[in-house]
Amino acid sequence: MKENKYDDEAFFEKYSQMYRSIYGLQGSGEWHEFEKLLPDFQGKRVLDLGCGYGWHCQYAMEHHAQYVLGVDISKRMLETAKQKHAHLQIEYRQIAMEDLTLEPDSFDVVFSSLALHYVKDYEQLVQHIANWLTKGGNFVFSVEHPVFTSYGNQDWYYDENGNILHFPVDRYFYEGQREAVFLQEEVVKYHRTLTTYLETLMKHGFMIQHVVEPQPPLEMMNMDGMKDEMRRPMMLLIAVQKV
């Protein structure tokens, strides 16, 4: 069964207090780089996989998309999206992205923010996206970096005084399920290598345009713990085009 942690009331409440949940795209440390990878939305049909609060759906509409479909497994996420970002041309649909069925060539742009590392069968999803996109269509997504997902618990190693020593990277080439800790709770994620992310895209007809390991923006460097984000990559951004 696909995990839906975000409909747990206590977990969702903690998520809602995160900086990015409160401040949206401008509160996301990778947004300044992710935005650079996005294509022109003018007149485009856009699909957002794992749309969450709908921030990216609203962004696409503000940039003159013709139609936006935002899908998410979480009822609570979509309720918030509809409250914050309702629009006649934005449709929100509750479904796991792995279960989504759409007509071939039905979208011009597909994007996804920090959701694909929750997907067990990445290759099957890439196949579906290639089918849904028109020729020349764009797929842009962010995931947790393979360095960040490899070990599992996603926490630093500390000394006896609680000072950070280093970040563990282990079992890198053993892809598959990890029991991560997020918001003090155990969450299932799926680790895969950088090679798998990129080669799978090329195998299914995508041309790689950009690969970015985003650094935190300067204006966030004084936030608690942000300087430590320079010690290892946390996120990976990829932009490709269907050829």
PLM-predicted stretches and their roles:
Residues 47-49, 53-100:
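Class I SAM-dependent methyltransferase SAM/SAH-binding core
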Residues 143, 147-156, 181-196:
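Acceptor-substrate binding/catalytic loop of class I
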Residues 123-138:
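A short glycine-rich, Lys/Arg-flanked "PGG" loop and its adjoining helix->strand segment in the class I
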Residues 108-123:
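A short SAM/SAH-binding and catalytic strip from SAM-dependent methyltransferases
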Residues 177, 188-212:
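Short alpha-helix
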